[in-house]
Design a protein with these regions (language model features):
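Bacterial Sec-dependent N-terminal signal peptides
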Residues: 1-22
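Extracellular and organelle-lumenal recognition/adhesion modules and their flexible linkers in secreted
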Residues: 18-201
């Protein structure tokens, strides 16, 4: 999992143009991953969607959404050229990752992370496969809207195990896009760090 995070972060950094403010960033404090088995859909196009309502505390704080094809092993990561798009629906931003399921993939990992400070809500995760040209099928996902009755609010997800006294995760019963609940992530007191480092030999 750690290698996956490094790969995704490097990929994100490599595709971003730096402004002066982007020489600073927040270290990643929290993430969760939805795994989707895909052996039955190899070679087909897919769409993955997640709704986010973000109230960042500053311009550097943000949500990051990524995805990757994964082979048989847990660290068997396959180069994945997915496209990320977004649209607004009321007070929510719906992020869509689209691409093709690799012929050697056993699963897709979809990764959501919070960098920085603020309140962030996640809800209404969905996954679609193009079974024939123009014919999309929605594939059921467990706990897609954080409505599970399990005491584990991350039932059906991988989640960062890093302990933090600056980040709180909980289910919100007051802010949600569909159903009656969403995942709320509240982060505070984090400090940005510089991308520029100086080393001496």
């Amino acid at each position: 999992m750690k290698r996956m995070l490094l790969f995704l972060l490097l990929a994100c950094a490599g595709t971003s143009a730096f402004s002066q403010s982007q020489w600073y960033y927040y270290a990643e404090e929290f993430y969760f991953v939805k795994e989707v088995p895909v052996t039955a859909f190899r070679g087909k196009n897919f769409r993955y969607e997640i709704a986010v309502k973000a109230s960042p505390a500053d311009t550097l704080s943000k949500v990051r959404i990524h995805g990757i094809n994964v082979g048989k092993g847990k660290e068997d990561f396959i180069n994945s050229d997915f496209v990320l798009e977004s649209r607004s629906e009321q007070e929510w931003t719906v992020y869509t990752l689209a691409g093709k399921i690799d012929e050697n993939a056993f699963r897709l990992w979809f990764y959501s992370a919070v960098n920085g400070n603020g309140s962030f809500y996640f809800d209404d995760i969905s996954f679609y496969v193009e079974m024939a040209p123009g014919q999309w099928k929605q594939v059921a996902l467990p706990n897609y809207s954080f409505e599970s009755n399990s005491k584990n609010i991350f039932d059906g997800y991988y989640v960062s195990k890093r302990a933090s006294n600056t980040t709180v995760t909980q289910v919100s019963n007051t802010v949600y896009k569909t159903g009656n609940r969403s995942l709320q992530v509240t982060s505070k007191k984090q400090q940005p760090v510089s991308l520029l480092t100086t080393s001496q030999e």
